[in-house]
Amino acid sequence: MTSPLLRIMIDAALAAGEEIERIYAEGCAAEEKLDGSPVTIADRHAELIILERLARDFTDIPVLAEEEACAGRIPELGARFFCVDPLDGTKGFVARTGEFTVNIALIENEEAIAGVIYAPDPRLLYYGARGEGAFRAEHKVEAEPIRVRPRPATGLIGVGSRNHAAPGTEERNARLGIKDYLPSGSSLKFCRLAEGAADVYPRHGRTMEWDTAAGQAILEAAGGRVMVLDGDAEAGPLRYGKIEDGFANPNFIAWGG
């Protein structure tokens, strides 16, 4: 049974997804933000919808949202806040790959404890929360539970970005024992681990908290974990609310089983 809080997060993601679908069908151009990343009218419209939905039901929980944060509008964050990426994978949206998502997470005491990821094309929903498990629902089909797969002794399946391969990726993959590689865009990489389609997602390169929070919550609810990397060594779970770092993440590795 889905908790009321998670249900509201799901409804907000679906509403934002509907607006993204509408704009996707019409087509739109991307602009460049100060950090060089792309943004479209779909990002902005979707974020407004999510902010309005969450504010209606959770007046006491602040929201860290990507476009607001990039514009310098950062609320005072307490121990509990929402972390939102209204359109993760804007490059995929503009290129019409279908690999873009709406990400909404709830953070509590620096940990991602609940998350929703919605892919408007092909209308695929993932969600999960601590103590509730993780689920996947296709369009108009009842949700089914998902779980990471047991880690194989050899021949790991790795997942990673189509657009952001860091220098040394092939060498690191070899050290991890990755034999097959599943390229994937946006936060869907975490979903591939959570549903047992892949085993490991090493990330060396720029990500922000809103890129990873929902995916981490879903993956951990499915039995996986996300760990900070210090070189090749794991150095504790990935945490949130890193305002002193501009909400940027360090290198990390996400594991399925």
Question: Which residues does each predicted region cover?
Answer:
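Residue-level signal for inorganic ion chemistry
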Residues: 20, 43, 54, 90, ...
